[in-house]
Amino acid sequence: HSYAPVPLDGWDKSDTLVYTLPNSIPAGNYEAEIGIRYQESYPYRDIWLEVSHNTKDTLTYVTDTLQLFLVDEAGNKTGNGLCGLYQCDLPYKASIPIRTEGSARTFRIVHIMTDNPLTGISDIGIRLRKPENQ
């Protein structure tokens, strides 16, 4: 995982979290997950994110809109928690192509919730891994 911290006073809609992939990541298809660290005080069951990446063609960004649930219908928090801080890993893409040519390959994440700033989120992360069948 590569995590980016969210400002303590809240995540403003204009605050873009940027993750640059190291050149050491070999080309291929990867599974991608979004990691979310959130506080018990987070007021919603879900979070809406826009995730953009230029991993296939460094000149073109592809944008996905995600609704990720942090609390299930029974009110149980997803992931693991300790001392009021929870962490969960949620699927993003089953197969995302990563190419090595060109300039920096990056992911960009912004929230698209109505609250501005959005409070209760501590960190957002990206995790890439090779599928088990490769």
Q: Which role fits each region the language model picked out?
A:
Residues 99-116, 120-130:
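Internal, hydrophobic beta-strand segments that form the core of beta-sheet-rich folds
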Residues 18-28, 94-100, 129-133:
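Extracellular and analogous surface-interaction loops
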Residues 1-52, 57:
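Start-of-domain marker
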Residues 29-31, 46-50, 65, 104, ...:
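Exposed beta-strand and adjacent loop surfaces of beta-rich binding modules
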Residues 16, 66-70, 78-94:
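A beta-strand/beta-hairpin structural motif
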